[in-house]
């Protein structure tokens, strides 16, 4: 059995908050267990790497952005709200991640043109604000008139944080020194104009970085060097021939590498498909393997505990 936590916004028939589901791998059925916590203005949710804590973002009754922390280490995997803090973002949080050590939370705000670092306490509560790192830049495509960070991720060794800035058309590299409250910009890679970096996936070896371009659908394969510099290995286009008929943005959404570093998955909302690539472990390069229809707009891709289940966050058209 796989426990799945889904954040939902307020709707005509749904209450905003974190919902708890149970997935039966044998029957392939997903059952709703209930609403775990009411969270108005929900925006993003993230499960820690050790799967004992969860963080989510929403808003309080006065409209301020909130960062909320939970524990889920009980036998029934129910959530316990452990604390919350107001965050100084601009009301458009679009991504949330934690480091492998479980000591930091990284909040990305599309409108704020910045990422925010917070402590993540062992009891599941968000801790002190550490730093806000702003960015500048622009490009030629839609929503690229200024910096608009779309997501940010810690490298597998926790030394760096990589930011996919759709607006500035750039991947930024920050060196993380939380003991000194320092998160310095040490590297960057700029995509071809109009591509729009959206989400990032790391190979388990920490050497190869895969960047999904929301607008064009390309995937950039980059090498992350020990000094924080990025170099391009290759740019590869999507698999499905259906993409050739799309006018405008492909609306690529999420990208994921499997736990063994052998396969890469990328979701494309415009054609409602997931593309699958093989990974050459020696070079990091990709080879197309196929694609699958999703019958809906897949916004998020996540691995289950077993490494077999791929949970899809579906966005209805």
How would you describe each model-predicted region?
Residues 4, 54, 105, 161, ...:
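Hydrophobic beta-strand positions that form the internal "hydrophobic ladder"
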Residues 9-11, 59-61, 110, 120, ...:
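Short loop/turn segments immediately following the C-termini of beta-strands
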Residues 14, 39-49, 88-100, 136-157, ...:
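Beta-rich, blade/repeat-based domains predominating
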Residues 21-28, 70-78, 118-127, 174-182, ...:
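Short loop/turn segments immediately following beta-strands, especially the blade-tip
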Residues 31-37, 80-87, 131, 137-143, ...:
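A short beta-strand motif characteristic of beta-propeller blades
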Residues 32-102:
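Blade-loop segments of beta-propeller domains
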Residues 78-151:
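Asp-box/WD-like beta-propeller blade repeats and closely related beta-sheet repeat scaffolds
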Residues 158-217:
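Loop-centered beta-sheet repeat module
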